[in-house]
Amino acid sequence: MEGGESAESTHNTKVSDSAYSNSCSNSQSQRSGSSKSRLSGSHSSGSSGYGGKPSTQASSSDMIIKRNKDKSRKKKKNKGAGQGAGQAGQSLISASTSLEGGAEEKPRPSGSGCGVEQQSCRELLQDQQHGEDHSEPKATEQLQQEEGDRSGSESEAERVENAAKSEAAQSFPIPSPLSVTIVPPSMGGCAGVGHAASLDSGLAKLDKTWEAGGPGKVEPVPGVPGTAAAGTGQRGERLKEESFCCVISMHDGIVLYTTPSITDVLGYPRDMWLGRSFIDFVHLKDRATFASQITTGIPIAESRGSVPKDTKSTFCVMLRRYRGLKSGGFGVIGRPVSYEPFRLGLTFREAPEEARPDNYMVSNGTNMLLVICATPIKSSYKIPDEILSQKSPKFAIRHTATGIISHVDSAAVSALGYLPQDLIGRSIMDFYHQEDLSVMKETYEMVMKKGQTAGASFCSKPYRFLIQNGCYVLLETEWTSFVNPWSRKLEFVVGHHRVFQGPKSCNVFEAAPTCKLKMSEEAQSRNTRIKEDIVKRLAETVSRPSDTVKQEVSRRCQALASFMETLMDEVSRADLKLELPHENELTVSERDSVMLGEISPHHDYYDSKSSTETPPSYNQLNYNENLLRFFNSKPVTAPAELDPPKTEPPEPRGTCVSGASGPMSPVHEGSGGSGSSGNFTTASNIHMSSVTNTSIAGTGGTGTGTGTGTGTGTGTGTGTGTGTGTGTGTGNGTNSGTGTGSASSNYRGGSVAIQPVTLTEALLNKHNDEMEKFMLKKHRESRGRSGEKSKKSATDTLKMLEYSGPGHGIKRGGSHSWEGEANKPKQQLTLGTDAIKGVVGGSGGVVGTGGGAGVAGGGGTGTGLAGTSDGRLTMSSGAGGVVGGPGGAAAAAGVISSVGSSMPGPSSYPTCTQNINLWPPFSVGITPPVHSTHTAMAQSSFSSAGLFPTFYYIPASLTPTSPTRSPRMHKHPHKGGPEMPTTSQQAAAAAAQAAQAMPLQYMAGVMYPHPSLFYTHPAAAAATAMMYQPMPFTGMTNALQIPERPLGSQSAYNKSMYTTTPPSMAKKVPGAFHSVTTPSQVQRSSSQSASVNAEPGCSASVSDPCKKEAPGSSPIPSVMGDYNSELPCSSSNPANNKKYTDSNGNSDDMDGSSFSSFYSSFIKTTDGSESPPDIEKDPKHRKLKSMSPSDSKIMEHPEEDQTQHGDG
């Protein structure tokens, strides 16, 4: 810039540029390539002779066309720029506007405005609105400052420019306050520019919007040094614009600004519209439309804030064309006023009111501006009778049932010559050709027929349509209609038209000829009648055949179903994917299909072999789990009995010595005679487990039992109860063996001081993730098991289903919820082979560990695994005190294998009967396997007795050596006897040992429901078919006898001979559990000696839920003796040895009541069908299940079936 010269415009002048200063940074540099007017926002500095006073120059040299006028302006500018500063360079100043249009107006002298202070934009608009001279320099000067402040860099040349322009402004007209070109920017030390700079931020943006909003673009501003290099001849080569823009003040409708292209479009000189009302140029018939658009657009603009961007409404009007000398020559008065159609785009803006440093405009809506971009509409036809292509644009016309046009597309204007407001409100029948009315009648008949089906459309024959210039065009139309679904009346008809053949006259906007087509009266009456018939037909009710309705409903239902499936597929495919091991046989269980209604989006994926298939959601699995929990809770289906009377404990009948402390002594009351069956008398049976615990709550006790076995099992149990005190108890059972097994059980709650874990979100999320994986894995396993289960016969399945109803037991109201343990997943207790075969020594039973330590009345249990002498594994458990009972109980319980004669004798054997129950009452799973090779010494038939025996299986370890193994070391009369005990003695010892460890009571006449009642696979039909049949019973329970086992045989372990003795008597005992069919309390005869309690909590073979007793409650006789070898117990055939057990210990094979260890009895989860334990204080009627005495089998491999006899 310094010292440089260039001649880029005819209006540029060389100016001294020597007065550079860095003191002001508010002046703006020229924006290159802009097509807007430029305003100078800088003031002259003191170096240029103005002392920093605001410049009042205003230059709008639009009318300057001849170059000779530039000379005087150059002189004045050079003269002013030379004051007070030497010229170090020259700069080009452009004082012409970029929006200059060829004008026919004469320049008007501008008033002198030197020294005038700046005004706000609001004052400017008010000045214009009040009719002040638009060429007043102060207004123009202010806008120049506003415009000049928009660019980002400053140049000192503006100071020189301001000095020159201030003089030049006095001799040039300024017709438009918004169109002045800025001169090259300079870095002047200008004072007071800040106001102009901030004020410009709004209108400069507005000016840019005006230019960009309209199709008409003006040529770039003459080049500024460093910007565009526009040549001098570019101004003369400016093309004509096809549209123009104008700005209107919404205060009074005055035009504030127009683009110069208005001259090319309408012929008006550019500033002829300034100061005039815009509506004066609108055709009279379109003024109402224009006003309607304005009143509609203003609220929209105001509701969108100060600057509603791109809120443009479009409509069509006719604008008046200029009648000048060029277009009309002389005699203007005699020529008619001509109008041309334009499509107007309205955009509402707000003028800036208040300047802010952040250039944010604040407006209260008082200075609303309307920006109008007008585009002329041209005719679509170029030649007469033009045949248009199929791709020609379509336009829509909608009319009501009476034929009145209600909507017209703006696209129809160029095709028909009518503006939309010209057609709206008129009858469409007036535009049809008279000869085509018959065709149109047929068309409307088809419209009514198609109206029966919603959305149906059809194309009609071509017909002629009248256009604006009086000619006809041939239209092809696709018709649709809308029928009111309630009134079944036609609401409107929509025609999507396409011009097939154009009119004879191409200019569709020409005025139509005044002459009308002559027609005979007969033809007119005929056409009028056809029009009336069409209107009547359209007014009829649209009938819909029932078949059509059904088809539509069916189609819509199918569409809806398809949509919903797609939607559910998208929604339900969560990110939860669990990588599970590949399984060979993945099948779909019937339960899944029923639960999901056969419409689950996951249904298709169940058979997938992929390990990444989408599993059911966690919510689905949790829902299934909750269902299981509900059914397992045994909802009450029969009234509950009153609390049974309590009886005092009987006198001890034997010399069974208990090592328990005082509070624990009732546990070990009973008889333990030396072999006579009379020790287990009716009296002792009657009061069995019916003792009211009166011992001190909260005190702990220890019980130890010793035996001659070689296995050692230790366990600790903790539990909670309703007592107020706390107590601890430990139960230890010791044997002389070397194998040890241990287990422990924890409980939550109670009064024991356990530090609770702080529940955090992370911990909760972790738990949820683990539960999701756990449940998904269980789901996968449960589906995979069905492939390897042997299928039972159809009849067995029917039987199972037939009796599955009674299988649901009654929920006992008084039962404990076992909050701490109820919902824990069952633990599969497994030991390594070293632990299983830990016993190497002499023959001996396994001593289970017992003992509950916990709150008084607690029920904590402990289970232990101890090795037998032959390397097998047995399990024993301990339990806490019952409610109201001692704080803890411990006893040594063991499964003692009996050795001796190969055939057991019929006599019973002595045991220690227990008169108090320390076990949480759980239902019993019937899973007593009996070896098939042993003879069953059944003295009474189950079918005749009508009693389904509660069967308990006592696994007895067998040494492979001799029957001369040392007897159990009970605190018993025959402890330590060196002689070889008889079979009955060994059995008695085993029973006594087990009874001490786990005192259990079994109820006569009660068949405890099968563990998995929710879903029983057909494979379990044989074992469960007869289980659910309630049968009346009159006989007594039979004694259980354990026969001698063959030595060294593979199946010697866990084999028992069960013989039944004839029932002796049946006596009703108050408060006992009764069968639904025969509510009589069955008592055990003395001959049914103590084999009953010999097996509680024995190794895996014992049905753990057999602990049906309730604390401190009614006398419940034991039912153990009633099993013979024909019982349809769980099958342990080698074919069925492999069982699938889920993660909760539930075996899907229902034959064995397969569940995990005894310990799992007390961590009752939701899978088992057994309910929480009953308290004998609130007994309920139980349904008696009967099982046919057939298909009895003995467990061959107790190691494998260890988890098949625990409670679910």
Swiss-Prot record:
GO CC annotations on file: nucleus; perinuclear region of cytoplasm
Post-translation changes: Phosphorylated with a circadian rhythmicity, probably by the double-time protein (dbt). Phosphorylation could be implicated in the stability of per monomer and in the formation of heterodimer per-tim.
Sequence ranges of Basic residues compositional bias: 66-79
Regions of compositional bias (Basic and acidic residues) in chain numbering: 129-139, 147-164, 1193-1208
Disulfide bonds: none
Domain of life of the native organism: Eukaryota
Biased composition (Polar residues): 679-697, 1127-1138
Cellular localisation: Nucleus; Cytoplasm, Perinuclear region
Record field: compositional bias (Gly residues): 698-740
Keyword terms: Biological rhythms, Cytoplasm, Nucleus, Phosphoprotein, Repeat
SUPFAM superfamilies, alphabetized: PYP-like sensor domain (PAS domain) (SSF55785)
Sequence repeats: 698-699, 701-702, 703-704, 705-706, 707-708, 709-710, 711-712, 713-714, 715-716, 717-718, 719-720, 721-722, 723-724, 725-726, 727-728, 729-730, 731-732, 734-735, 737-738, 739-740, 741-742
One Gene Ontology molecular-function label: transcription corepressor binding
Biased composition (Low complexity): 16-47, 217-232, 1076-1092, 1142-1161
Keyword Cytoplasm: yes
Subunit structure: Forms a heterodimer with timeless (TIM); the complex then translocates into the nucleus.
Role noted for this protein: Essential for biological clock functions. Determines the period length of circadian and ultradian rhythms; an increase in PER dosage leads to shortened circadian rhythms and a decrease leads to lengthened circadian rhythms. Essential for the circadian rhythmicity of locomotor activity, eclosion behavior, and for the rhythmic component of the male courtship song that originates in the thoracic nervous system. The biological cycle depends on the rhythmic formation and nuclear localization of the TIM-PER complex. Light induces the degradation of TIM, which promotes elimination of PER.
Domain notes: The run of Gly-Thr is implicated in the maintenance of circadian period at different temperatures. Deletion of the repeat leads to a shortening of the courtship song cycle period, and thus could be important for determining features of species-specific mating behavior.
Descriptive protein name: Period circadian protein
Species of the source: Drosophila yakuba
